[in-house]
Structures are given as C-alpha cells and as structure tokens.
C-alpha cells in the first residue's frame, strides 16, 4: 500500500502535520455542539407543537362553548314554549273533562228546573201539552245512573226497613191471573216499566197482554222518594208478546219483545226465528210499533229472545240485551264452533284434567233440552235517529269471553257500560261484565266483554246445576237476579275486593225461595236482609239504586216476583229501602 501523504511514519510514532490531542478535542466538541443544537431544535419543535395544540384546543373550546351556549339558549326557549303549551293543554283537558261536563250538567239541570217551573196548568191557561212535565224531581236528577261510591276504600253498609209508598206496579186481579217478567229502566228525566199479564196462570206461550208505564221520581212529605206514574199503555191487541225489555228514551219508552204462541223448546227446535217487535211509546200518547229483522238474524238463529232486563239509550243508539239459539251449521255457528269460556273460582276450584274440563265447558253451550242449538248472548243495536226507517243489527260477543247465552240487562253508570248475564248454565255465581262497543257506519259492529270475578254467593239451580256445582256441565237452570253496582270496578291489583254491589238474591242452592236483600263485595256478602217469611217462594228480581243529592241519601228499589196466595201465582212488588254507607 502506498504511504499516506498526510502522515510521516517513523519509529517514534509521530504524526504530521500537528499533535493528535488537539484534533480529538475538536471532534468531540463538534459532536457535542451538534447534539446540543439538535436537542434545542427538538425542544423548540415540541414547544411549538404543544403551543399550537393548546391554541387549537383553546379555539375549539371557545367554539364549542359558543355552540353549547347557543344550544342551551334554544333548549331554554323550547322548554319555556313547552311549559306554556303544557299549561294550555292542562287547561284544555281540565275544561273538557271537568269544567265543561259540570257546566253542561248544570245547564241541563237548570233547563229541567225551568221546564218544570214554566210547564204548569192553570184553570184557564195551559202552557204545556200535558199537565205534568216528564221530569224527575231535581233532588234526584244528578244522582241517577251514578256510582254511589267513587273511592276504593273499605265501607260498611246497612239496609233500612222497606219504606211505605204507593206501588207503581199493578197486580193480577183474579186467582188464576199472573203478572210476570218485570223490566225497569230509570233515566235522568223519567222511568219506564213493563211486565207481562198472562191470562191463563203463568203459561206465557198461550195468551197475554203487556202493561207499560212511565213516570217520574218525586219527593214525598216524609222526605223519601215515590215513583209517580204519569202514563199507562195496556197493549191488548191479540199479540202474545214475551220476554219484553224496556228502556228510557227521550220523551218516552222503547220496548223490545218477541211474539210467539209456542213453547220455548219448540222455538229452539225450529229454524226460523219468531217475530221481533220494537215498540216506541211517547209521553204525548203516541205509540209506534215495528216488526224488525236485525242484520245477521235470518239464516243464523233458530230463535232470538229479548233479555228481559232493561236496555239503554247510549250515544244516539238504543241497545237491548238478547239471546237465543244459533244454528250450528250457519255462518255464525261455524264461526263460534270452538269458542268457550270457563271461569274458575280460585277458592273452590273444580278438580279434573284441564282438557276434559275444557271439553265439558264447550259442550255446555249446546244443551239437549234446547235441541242442541248453541245458546248465545247478543245485543240488539238500533240507530236512534233512524229508529222508524231502518232495521237494527245484532252484535254478538265472543264466547271466549262469555258463558252460555241467557237473559240479561245492560247498565249505563257514569258513562260506563256493564252487562248482567243470568247464570243459566253450570256457573252458579253472579255474572257481570264490563263491555265496550265499536260501532261502524258500514260493516259489522263489535263488542268486547271483560268478566268481573264474583264469588260471594250462588243462585239456586236444579239437578246437577245446583248452587253448589262449580264444574262444567250442560244444563238450563238458575234464575234472573240482576245486581246494581255501587262502585266502579278496577282492574288494578289489590283494590278489586272493594267492588260493591247490591240486589235481591234467593237464599237457597236448589229452590227458588227466601228472597233476601244484600250488599256484597267480590268474595263475601257484607249485609243480608231477608224479606218475608222463611220459605217464601220468589223468582225474578231486578234492582236499581239512586241518590238524593239534596241530603245525600241513597235509595234502592228491589223489584221482586213474590208468591201470592190470593191473586195469581206471583205478585210483582217494588221494595224501596234506604241504603246507609259508612
């Protein structure tokens, strides 16, 4: 290798051009300097980055703060507007649900009061079409068809002694006469009543007439009410009207009957339903009667029977209870084929395989006594504004919600609809439902039924369907004993036990004897007040309660069919009592 031109090598190991220590020191210094410069630059860069980041953050925070401030302001504005709107809505809701109804009711009462004042008859001048207006005493108007108890608290009851008043129900006048099947409806302005007057003992398939009356509630000098009869119609035209239901309507009464001169069993055995009659009786003595053919009747029903219990005037419609025999192979019969309702008393259940009990419950709708027809409940619904020109419709509830069809009553209390169904089949307890209708201008209307579980007492029944039986079986038994609810029923858990109702029961499990006034809760009787002597025979009972808003007294009229040893088999008696609630 060629020697370096920069160095002179000798044995003394010396270098040219200068000393080795100076060069090394300079190199070390340069390295340190460079490291220092790079470090300073790095630190500076980091500081710049941090500073820029902080500036960006501050800028962003300021913008976000401004945005949040703007949003907060808008939320506050919206909250103010919502609060204002809610305040207005609360005023509207209170006005519509509380103030307006009270004002309307007050105006109505004022109008009725004015009518009662100006509608008088003097010796020379009469300013009315009739001497007495068809308007109840103002003390009672506001206490009719209202729940007597609005809370769900525990209460005690006392049924007073029967009050002495003139009976508004005439009796038979011969030993072989018979008055039966009372139907009573109390409206805000007046009441309507009807019963059947049978010419040959109590065989209603032969020949009978129909007694109809209307009147008002007035206060007697004794302080308690009296049912003052203002109009009477006695329908004696050769038609054998049966099982009539009555309803109060504007200025009069509406009555739904069917006409038949054969046995009930023969009606069910046939295939063509008997004549259906709708009769309108007004305070001006006008009587209009129509033969109706409700939609869904022909081809589906072997027979259709009014429910006996009263109907209602509701939302410009006339609604009556009905029941009858559905032809199994008809359109309606096929639709209902597999439907059944089997209530259970948890305190006294029926034992056995569930599937077997369900099958027996289904078969109970087809009693052989009534030619194996499906015995079905229904409602006759008629549009009031076209009552003279259009037919009515039959609205049929699902049998998944109701027991076998039977006599019944439709109640309207505090604008809530309830339906009593006679316990004609195997179930021995009172049957009461809350109901709601869905009406349509075209097509089929519908009804929903919600059973109210009552287990406090049973009706008398015969054979295997006595009051002690709680298991499904096909039978036709029982008796009509409608209740009057004193409180609204609530589905809220824990308060249902304080649902109270009153009526007249027959205190026997097998025989129609021992009429007894009662007040009951769902599961137990609160008060029992026997009427008459032990063993007294009785039959149908219907009950209506109302309040004297002048002194807050509560009255109930229990209309009962009682045995008579003097005139006829039964005498229909209205028993008026004061009900004390504490």
From Swiss-Prot:
The chain crosses the membrane at residues 35-55. GO terms for biological process: symbiont entry into host cell; virion attachment to host cell. Residues 1-34 are intravirion. Homotetramer; composed of disulfide-linked homodimers. Interacts with F protein trimer. It is a single-pass type II membrane protein. Gene3D superfamilies: 1.20.5.110, 2.120.10.10. The C-terminus (head domain) is involved in binding the cellular receptor. The record marks 512 as: Binding to the host receptor. Its EC number is 3.2.1.18. This is Hemagglutinin-neuraminidase. Residues 56-582 are virion surface. Belongs to the paramyxoviruses hemagglutinin-neuraminidase family. It is an enzyme of class 3 (hydrolase). Keywords: Disulfide bond, Glycoprotein, Hemagglutinin, Host cell membrane, Host membrane, Host-virus interaction, Hydrolase, Membrane, Signal-anchor, Transmembrane, Transmembrane helix, Viral attachment to host cell, Viral envelope protein, Virion, Virus entry into host cell.
């Amino acid at each position: 290798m060629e020697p370096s031109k920069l160095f002179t090598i000798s044995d003394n190991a010396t270098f040219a051009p200068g000393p080795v220590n100076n060069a090394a020191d300079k190199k070390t210094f340069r390295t340190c300097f460079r490291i220092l410069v790079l470090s300073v630059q790095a630190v500076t860069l980091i500081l710049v980055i941090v500073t820029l980041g902080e500036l960006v953050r501050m800028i962003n925070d300021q913008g976000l703060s401004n945005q949040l401030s703007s949003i907060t302001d808008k939320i506050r504005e919206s909250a103010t507007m919502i609060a204002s709107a809610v305040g207005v809505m609360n005023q509207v809701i209170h006005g519509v649900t509380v103030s307006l109804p009270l004002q309307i009711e007050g105006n109505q009462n004022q109008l009725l009061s004015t009518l009662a004042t100006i509608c008088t008859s003097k010796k020379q001048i009469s300013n009315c079409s009739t001497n007495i207006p068809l308007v109840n005493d103002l003390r009672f108007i506001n206490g009719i068809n209202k729940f007597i108890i609005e809370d769900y608290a525990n209460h005690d009851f006392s049924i007073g002694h029967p009050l002495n008043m003139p009976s508004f129900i005439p009796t038979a006048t011969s030993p072989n006469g018979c008055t039966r099947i009372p139907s009573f409806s109390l409206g805000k302005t007046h009441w309507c009543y009807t019963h059947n007057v049978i010419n040959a003992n109590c065989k209603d398939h032969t020949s009978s007439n129909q007694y109809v009356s209307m009147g008002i509630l007035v206060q007697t000098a004794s302080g308690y009410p009296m049912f003052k009869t203002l109009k009477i119609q006695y329908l004696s035209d050769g038609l054998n009207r049966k099982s009539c239901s009555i309803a109060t309507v504007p200025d009069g009464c509406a009555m739904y009957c069917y006409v038949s001169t054969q046995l009930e069993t023969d009606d069910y055995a046939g295939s063509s339903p008997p004549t259906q009659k709708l009769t309108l009786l007004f305070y001006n003595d006008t009587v209009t009667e129509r033969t109706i053919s409700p939609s869904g009747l022909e081809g589906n029903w072997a027979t259709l029977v009014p429910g006996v219990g009263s109907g209602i005037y509701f939302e410009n419609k006339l609604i009556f209870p009905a029941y009858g025999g559905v032809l199994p192979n008809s359109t309606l019969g096929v639709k209902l084929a597999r439907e059944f309702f089997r209530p259970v008393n948890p305190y006294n259940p029926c034992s056995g395989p569930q599937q077997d009990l369900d099958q027996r419950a289904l078969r109970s709708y087809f009693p052989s006594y009534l030619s194996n027809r499906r015995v079905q409940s229904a409602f006759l619904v008629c549009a009031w504004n076209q009552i003279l020109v259009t037919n009515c419709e039959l609205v049929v509830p699902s049998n998944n919600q109701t027991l076998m069809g039977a006599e019944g009553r439709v109640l309207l209390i505090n604008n809530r609809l309830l339906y009593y169904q006679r316990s004609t089949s195997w179930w021995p307890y009172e049957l009461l439902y809350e109901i709601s209708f869905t009406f349509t201008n075209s097509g089929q209307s519908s009804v929903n039924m919600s059973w109210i579980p009552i287990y406090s007492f049973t009706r008398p029944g015969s054979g295997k369907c006595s009051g002690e039986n709680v298991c499904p079986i096909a039978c036709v038994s029982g008796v009509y004993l409608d209740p009057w609810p004193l409180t609204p029923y609530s589905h809220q858990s824990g308060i249902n036990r304080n649902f109270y109702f009153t009526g007249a029961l027959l205190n026997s499990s097998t025989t129609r004897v021992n009429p007894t006034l009662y007040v009951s809760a769902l599961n137990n009787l609160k008060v029992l007040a026997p009427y008459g002597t032990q063993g007294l025979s009785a039959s149908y009972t219907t009950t209506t309660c109302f309040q004297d808003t002048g002194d807050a007294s509560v009255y109930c009229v229990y209309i009962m069919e009682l045995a008579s040893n003097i005139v006829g088999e039964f005498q229909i008696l209205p028993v008026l009592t004061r009900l004390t609630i504490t």
